């Protein structure tokens, strides 16, 4: 194992220096991790919109939904939430979620925010858990949680606090299995949504004479081939026309084939998929796009994405998380007028199921939680908030008010999220270790999934990484199983 790590360290020394110098310290959504992220800022316009609570008739509609919740008295009404963002609207300016509305009204519950920062979140989690402070929940959509949070004793199984066979939990049973290790569930999953979407300006598509990507999707013709064809036809650097922008388009396109770098094994552990032929197909597709000039040349723009070029008509596609347009349009970075906003799922291979990288929303239950029952009931409120028609209607209205989305965009986002729920793909590289992630999903431009867009063919990269990564993942798998057995 020491020799393996020396080999990988040598590889990283050769490939990472330039990338780190050029790109800086980025989060998964392309943001800077060097600053304290405890306080979320919003525009005055957004805050003004969000000061409004439930509208006429919504109280009654919500009361009907709450009848589906367990009729119990919650002795401890406070759920302690450790995160780099608050769930309460008083500090964020965001409107109150339907799930939180129901938790407060049904159980008299409240969510106490224990603030941390993105960079210090795991150190603070360890301090809270080891100090016996009774922190209850941690963001479940953090891809670095599992399995290392189990191995380090930060998280516990949730099975003792929910009835997976109940009507409410059956709605998310498949999502629960995404974080099922050794036969135990480790997250209170509330919904599964798309990790990334493709954004485009409809006016640019029309001006080019292209078929609208959403219309192609509805006809079952939105796939790698049609995606590639549009890029080939549009890209012309001499005319300042660029193709595919985004910090994380590599991961989205990789996941769209259905196989992650590091995935679940049949026995509830983790395994390397680097030798999988489907993964190879995804990497070869990205290599082809790169060789044909489809990737946006960030190196010409101080290594930064330029999403505002979408609205200028000089960029065709931008793969990014939905958060990019979940704000007042005045703050959108894409520069697209709301009426011209186009969204569509990340395309998959021809004749493939439409796999999507999945964002698993919910809460990891902290070891030593003081209120696991409250955490589970809060999760149930959020499940119903995402599926009950009356609650969904309220959430839709909030999206239209808060983000100025049209009904068309609301409906399209639902359809994209439904795809992610039906065909979810989750990668566990970041959750295994920062070392494994740096060689597979989160490293420099010349490593792992980023190699193809840097001009390195997958066969060469696979030959370099396959055996060492397999050894590192096997070590994590053994430690995971030992930790589960010890619980």
PLM ranges: what are they?
Residues 228-231, 266-300:
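Glycine-centered hinge/linker elements that transmit conformational signals in sensory
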Residues 333-401:
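Extracytoplasmic/periplasmic substrate-recognition and gating elements
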Residues 44-75, 117, 142-195, 225, ...:
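Hinge/lid segment of periplasmic solute-binding proteins
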Residues 44-59, 386-487:
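Conserved C-terminal helix/tail region of periplasmic/extracytoplasmic solute-binding proteins
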Residues 101-171, 185, 207-209, 213, ...:
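Extracytoplasmic "Venus flytrap"/periplasmic binding protein-like
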Residues 70, 126-128, 135-136, 164-204, ...:
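A structural signal for short loop-to-beta-strand junctions that line the ligand-binding cleft
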Residues 9, 23-147, 389-390, 458-487:
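Conserved N-terminal structural module of periplasmic/extracytoplasmic solute-binding proteins
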Residues 80-82, 181-191, 196, 206, ...:
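Extracytoplasmic/periplasmic solute-binding protein
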């Amino acid at each position: 194992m020491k020799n393996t790590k020396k080999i990988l360290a040598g590889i990283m020394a050769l490939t990472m220096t330039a990338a780190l110098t050029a790109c800086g310290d980025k989060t998964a959504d392309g943001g800077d991790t060097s600053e304290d992220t405890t306080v979320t800022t919003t525009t005055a316009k957004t805050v003004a919109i969000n000061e409004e609570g439930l509208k006429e008739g919504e109280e009654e509609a919500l009361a009907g939904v709450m009848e589906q919740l367990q009729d119990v008295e919650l002795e401890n009404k406070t759920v302690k939430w450790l995160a780099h963002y608050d769930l309460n609207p008083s500090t964020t300016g965001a409107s109150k979620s339907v799930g939180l509305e129901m938790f407060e009204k049904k159980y008299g519950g409240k969510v106490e925010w224990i603030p941390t920062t993105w960079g210090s979140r795991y150190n603070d989690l360890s301090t809270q858990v080891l100090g016996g402070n009774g922190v209850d929940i941690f963001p479940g959509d953090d891809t670095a949680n599992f399995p290392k949070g189990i191995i380090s004793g930060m998280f516990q199984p949730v099975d003792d606090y929910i009835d997976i066979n109940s009507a409410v939990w059956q709605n998310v049973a498949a999502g629960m299995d995404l974080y099922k290790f050794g036969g135990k569930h480790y997250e209170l999953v509330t919904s599964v949504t798309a990790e990334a979407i493709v954004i485009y300006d409809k006016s640019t598509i029309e001006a080019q004479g292209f078929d609208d990507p959403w219309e192609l999707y509805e006809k079952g013709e939105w796939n790698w081939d049609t995606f590639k064809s549009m890029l080939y036809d549009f890209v012309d650097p001499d005319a300042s026309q660029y193709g595919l922008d985004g910090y994380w388009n590599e991961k989205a396109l990789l996941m769209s084939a259905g196989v992650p770098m590091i995935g679940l094994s049949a026995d509830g552990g983790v395994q390397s998929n680097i030798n999988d032929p489907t993964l190879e197909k995804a990497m070869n597709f990205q290599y082809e796009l790169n060789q044909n000039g489809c990737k946006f040349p960030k190196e010409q723009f101080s290594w930064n994405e330029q999403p505002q070029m979408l609205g200028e008509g000089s960029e065709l596609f931008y793969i990014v998380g939905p958060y990019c347009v979940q704000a007042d349009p005045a703050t959108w970075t894409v520069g697209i007028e709301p009426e011209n906003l186009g969204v569509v799922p990340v395309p998959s291979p021809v004749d493939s199921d439409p796999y999507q990288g999945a964002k698993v929303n919910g809460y990891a239950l902290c070891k030593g939680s003081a209120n696991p029952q409250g955490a589970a009931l809060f999760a149930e409120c959020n499940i119903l908030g995402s599926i009950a028609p009356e609650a969904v209607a309220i959430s839709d209205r909030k999206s239209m008010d808060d983000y100025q989305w049209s009904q068309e965009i609301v409906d399209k986002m639902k359809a994209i999220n439904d795809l992610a729920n039906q065909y979810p793909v989750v990668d566990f590289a970041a959750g295994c270790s920062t070392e494994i992630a740096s060689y597979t999903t989160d490293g420099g431009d010349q490593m792992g999934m980023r190699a193809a867009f840097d001009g390195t063919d997958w066969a060469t990269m696979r030959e370099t990484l396959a055996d060492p990564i397999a050894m590192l993942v096997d070590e994590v798998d053994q430690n995971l199983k030992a930790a589960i057995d010890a619980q």
